[in-house]
Regions:
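Pseudouridine synthases involved in rRNA/tRNA modification
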Residues: 5-32, 190-203, 221-284
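Residue-level recognition of short loop/turn positions
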Residues: 36, 42, 212, 260-261
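Short, surface-exposed secondary-structure edge patches
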Residues: 47-51, 207, 246
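RNA pseudouridine synthases
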Residues: 5-186, 274-279
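A generic structural motif
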Residues: 167, 209, 257-259
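Short beta-strand segments enriched for Tyr within beta-sheet-rich domains
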Residues: 149, 204, 214-222
Length: 284
């Protein structure tokens, strides 16, 4: 639904709606509730086109059966957890969320302790990793925490570090600013180690800091400078695709200020074993 005064743009209208109902901490969740007819204005089912100007009675009615949700039995490594948020390890070969049952999001209730806070909700990831990418994922456990963590990402107050193994002879460090889908994007990199490879010339362990958050940003950026990530089937050079061993891209750490306790958090998720094998004489 929309305000007819005061908040002129769509983004602010959606933010207003999210602020009303703590059961729906994100704009996408609010839209789903509207589509399912859970929200009424003055007793009439609302839609995204419903206008409000002040003084209306807005109500939420969720059928009881929709509050229960099957959880996916996938054991997860929990790296950090409190009543507000959690940080978990995402294995390769699973979606973070989406319209499937076997997702990381659906496995969270079995792996996390229920929050004792008043606005506790079903745990939700607040960002995504690609299907083949491993590593660290941040999760909100309360409605207010999910909103606060989303805001930290929007304001670029969460520092993300990735590691990848790339192909070819690279400069020691650099900044990639190739636009993605016509929009500015920036990634900083530093080569930590390099080893010769009969098939690939050189393989490099690269530390990566994405400064923007575009879809497939690191994969596209490294491909754009001629040094694709090992195992990447979508962004690869002819004849240099490694099959059967997955994508060598790992979300290594997150650093940010806890939005409620204000404690600094720096949480890491160690490199997969397959990364180390390349640099200890076993190759690929």
């Amino acid at each position: 639904f929309c305000l007819s005064r005061g908040l002129g743009d769509v983004y602010k209208r959606q933010e207003y709606g999210v602020g009303i109902f703590e059961a729906f901490p994100t704009k996408s969740a609010l839209k789903k509730a509207l589509k399912k007819g859970y929200i009424k204005v003055d007793g009439v089912i609302a839609s995204t086109a419903t206008l409000i100007s002040g003084g209306e009675q807005i109500s939420l009615d969720i059928p009881l059966e929709t509050t229960t949700k099957r959880s996916f039995a996938l054991p997860l490594n929990v790296l950090f957890e409190d009543d507000y948020l959690a940080v978990i390890h995402k294995p390769a070969g699973i979606e973070v969320s989406g319209n499937k049952f076997k997702t990381l999001a659906n496995a969270l209730p079995r792996n996390l302790e229920p929050s004792s806070l008043y606005d506790a909700t079903i745990p939700q990831p607040v960002h995504r990793l690609d299907y083949a990418t491993t590593g660290i994922v941040l999760v909100g456990k309360t409605a207010s925490s999910i909103r606060a963590l989303n805001k930290l990402f929007e304001e670029k107050k969460i520092d993300k570090t990735y590691y990848a193994i790339t192909i070819g002879t690279m400069k020691r460090n650099g900044r990639i600013e190739t636009a993605i889908d016509g929009k500015p994007a920036q990634s900083d990199y530093e080569v930590m180690k390099s080893v010769p490879s009969d098939r690939f010339g050189f393989l490099n362990l690269v530390n990566l800091h994405p400064k923007t958050g575009k879809r497939h940003q690191l994969r596209k950026h490294l491909f754009s400078i001629g040094h694709p990530i090992l195992g990447d089937k979508d962004y690869a050079l002819d004849g240099l695709i490694l099959k059967g061993k997955g994508l060598y891209l790992h979300a290594y750490s997150l650093e940010f200020e806890h939005p409620f306790t204000k404690n600094p958090l720096h949480i890491t998720d160690g490199l997969p074993e397959k990364f180390g094998k390349i640099f200890h004489g076993k190759g690929v």
